[in-house]
Amino acid sequence: MYMPLALVYASFLTLPASTSPATKGNVIQIQVHNIVNLAQTTVAHIRKLRMQLLMAPPIEITTPPIKGLASFSHYLKHLDNELQSPDTDLLSQIQADVSSLDGKVQSLGLMMNCPFQPRPTAEVSRFLFPDIHHYWTIAKVENYLESLHLNRDKLKVC
């Protein structure tokens, strides 16, 4: 009777030694993984929207390079501003994804003490051809987020 009780007691004593709290490095790695997953989900939403609207395949657009968290967040804010369109509600899911992605990037940046630029001012303008503008904006978002997969190591730098 004492032997099983002693084994249970010994297992409780060794439990805290075998499980360690998450380190800052582990938390950063998990956050980067979550950011990349959300970016991939956003790209999937873009492709689904493109199929629903029978849009042409994506065009090649040059987007700024991802240098670190600050530059990534700044361009995400710019894209978020472009996605907030008074003309259509079709982009609301993608806009919500980009906004959420920026929130995750901001959170990671605060953990790493990164300096962030203020949000760029939104340009409120009516486009002569809003559908073309939406197509162009979606292509920019898709291209930028696809480049994140190749540059995920830049998310560990301010």
Swiss-Prot record:
Instruction: Give me the Gene Ontology terms describing cellular component.
Output: extracellular region
Q: Which domain of life is it from?
A: Eukaryota
Q: What's this chain's function?
A: May function as part of a signaling pathway that acts to regulate the size of the body fat depot.
The name of this protein is: Leptin-B
In what tissue types does this protein appear?
Highly expressed in the brain and eye. Expressed at low levels in muscle and skin.
Which compartments does it reside in? Secreted
Primary localization class, coarse: secreted
Q: Which organism is it from?
A: Oryzias latipes (Japanese rice fish)
On whether Metal-binding is a keyword of this UniProt record, the answer is: no
Give the family from UniProt.
Answer: Belongs to the leptin family.
Which lineage is the organism of this entry classified under, starting from the top rank? Eukaryota, Metazoa, Chordata, Craniata, Vertebrata
Cystine links in this protein are C114-C158
Signal peptide positions on this chain:
1-19
Keywords from the named record:
Disulfide bond, Secreted, Signal
InterPro entries, per the entry: 4_helix_cytokine-like_core
